[in-house]
Amino acid sequence: MYWSPNVDTSSAPVAPYWPGASYVDVVGVDCYPTSSPLPSSAFASCYSNFYKTYSAAYDIPFAIGETGYAGSSGNAAWVSQLVNQDMCEYPNYIAASWFEYDKEANFLIVEGSSSILSSAQQLLLHNTKTGCGSGETSLGDLFGE
C-alpha cells in the first residue's frame, strides 16, 4: 500500500492514521511550498520530519505524493530541489508526483510556459545523483536520453 496523507502539521497530525509498517510498502506526503523567493531549505522543510518518522524509521521507500510551486521564483527552482536531493540524507527517496493543474495557483509545467517545461526536462533528464557509495546515474541515462 502507498500511504500518502495530504499534509502533516501540528494542527493536522497524521500519526493517528498511520496503519503500521507491516501494511505500508511506500510512504509519501503532499507539500506545496509558498515562500517567495523559494529558500534552498524548502525540500527539508516540507519533507524531512515526515521522512525521518515514516520512511527512515521503518526503512520504507519515500515518494512525494503531490507537489507544485507557483511562487514568483518559478517552478524550475522547486523542480531543481526535487531532483537534486542528497541521496545520503534521503536514501529511500524514489519518486515525486507533480500537480499539473491551474487551480488556486498556476502549477503547470507541461502545459505552461515552454521555458519552464524545457528547464524541468533538462533537470529531470540530465540531473546526476550521487548516492552514498554508489556511482553517478542521471534519469536521462535510465531513459536513454
Locations of regions flagged by a protein language model:
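A structural signal for short, well-ordered beta-strand segments and their strand-loop junctions
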Residues: M1-S4, I64
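Short secondary-structure transition/capping segments
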Residues: S4, P39-T53, K103-S118
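Alpha-helical scaffolding within the catalytic cores
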Residues: P5-P19, S41-Y54, A77-D86
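Active-site-proximal loop/turn and secondary-structure-junction residues that shape catalytic pockets
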Residues: P5-T9, P33, G68-Y69, D102
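Short, Lys/Arg-enriched charge-dense amphipathic segments
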Residues: W18-P33, S115-K129
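Glycoside hydrolase catalytic-domain groove-lining segments
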Residues: S22-S73
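Substrate-binding cleft of secreted/luminal carbohydrate-active enzymes
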Residues: I60-E145
